[in-house]
Regions:
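Residues at secondary-structure transition points
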Residues: 2, 13, 33, 40-47, ...
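C-terminal effector-binding regulatory domain of bacterial HTH transcription factors
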Residues: 156-184
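Short linear motifs at protein or domain termini
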Residues: 1-66, 175-184
Length: 184
């Protein structure tokens, strides 16, 4: 932390606080007197994160379902159109986060949305590595469009099923990226 503070001309305290925050979010492993490194979740951690995502996102979707209106549905469609136009991995991931936040936003559950973001962060690193052009992009786009349609129709059971399939496909990508990094 001393080197980072010196390089950026800031005191050590905010650097330590930032590193502690990254560590608490599971993004950084700190070995005292040895430094820090970016953490790599293991397959079991990925599975646990997705199990939790199923619970949190399923609940958010169910609570948001009856609260969407024409404006929010148009916004979901606009976000999905922009997402399909994204041509880089990081742009695609930020667009996907925006889509899901708009999908769940009408639930008006800020703590659940914060938990959704926290559960997603370690997964997105590995999805970003595995997501090449067209790798799964069309499948995700189709699932998003089907989610919009089922939300517009108020079909809770179909929306839940599509979300579960969507998260399972993403789990598969994240696990493949995790095992590709030599983690198990």
């Amino acid at each position: 932390s001393d080197l980072i503070a010196a390089e950026y001309g800031v005191s050590r305290i905010p650097v330590r606080e930032a590193l502690a925050q990254l560590q608490s979010e599971g993004l950084l492993e700190i070995a005292h007197y040895r430094g820090a490194r970016v953490s790599r979740p293991r397959a079991g951690e990925i599975d646990e994160l997705f199990d939790l995502r199923q619970l949190v996102e399923g609940d958010l979707l169910a609570r948001a379902l009856g609260r969407h209106d024409q404006r929010s549905l148009r916004e979901l469609t606009r976000l999905q159109d922009a997402l399909e136009d994204a041509d880089d991995r990081l742009g695609w991931i930020s667009g996907d986060i925006a889509f899901h936040e708009a999908l769940y936003g009408p639930a008006e559950r800020p703590r659940s949305l914060a938990l959704f973001r926290q559960l997603r962060a370690p997964i997105d690193r590995f999805s970003a590595q595995a997501l090449g052009p067209g790798a799964r992009k069309q499948g995700w786009a189709d699932e998003h469009r089907r989610l919009i349609a089922t939300v517009a129709a108020g079909d809770a059971a179909a929306a839940r099923t599509i979300l579960e399939q969507h998260l399972q496909a993403t789990r598969t990508i994240a696990l493949a990226a995790c095992s590709g990094d030599g983690e198990s």
